[in-house]
Amino acid sequence: MNYLILISFALLVITGVESARDAYIAKPHNCVYECFDAFSSYCNGVCTKNGAKSGYCQILGTYGNGCWCIVLPDNVPIRIPGKCHR
């Protein structure tokens, strides 16, 4: 009986948890949203529109100048290693 309660509680916790991550938000074809001004609100707008807490322009980052989002939901595509196919 105790195992049934423990398993039920674990399933409740697992299904109710949504995770998020910090990453470069990706356009279709695995390309980053490019930015050129670190003080512009462009990236923050792109990120928050897609459900992130905030965002900023990462200058000279891994994929060049791109929008970096903080606490981006899992259902939003992020830039992954590999080529950008424009």
Curated annotation (Swiss-Prot):
It is found in: Secreted. Keywords: Disulfide bond, Ion channel impairing toxin, Neurotoxin, Secreted, Signal, Toxin, Voltage-gated sodium channel impairing toxin. Residues 86 form a propeptide. The keyword Disulfide bond applies. Expressed by the venom gland. It holds the Pfam family Toxin_3. Disulfide bonds join C31-C84, C35-C57, C43-C67, C47-C69. Residues 21-85 form the LCN-type CS-alpha/beta domain. It comes from the Eukaryota. Residues 1-19 form the signal peptide. The keyword DNA-binding does not apply. CDD domains: neurotoxins_LC_scorpion. GO terms for biological process: defense response. Belongs to the long (4 C-C) scorpion toxin superfamily. Sodium channel inhibitor family. Alpha subfamily. Negative results: shows no effect on Nav1.2/SCN2A, Nav1.3/SCN3A, Nav1.4/SCN4A, Nav1.5/SCN5A, Nav1.6/SCN8A, Nav1.7/SCN9A and Nav1.8/SCN10A. Has the structural arrangement of an alpha-helix connected to antiparallel beta-sheets by disulfide bonds (CS-alpha/beta). Alpha toxins bind voltage-independently at site-3 of sodium channels (Nav) and inhibit the inactivation of the activated channels, thereby blocking neuronal transmission. This toxin inhibits inactivation of drosophila DmNav1 (EC(50)=130 nM). This is Sodium channel neurotoxin MeuNaTxalpha-4. It comes from Mesobuthus eupeus.
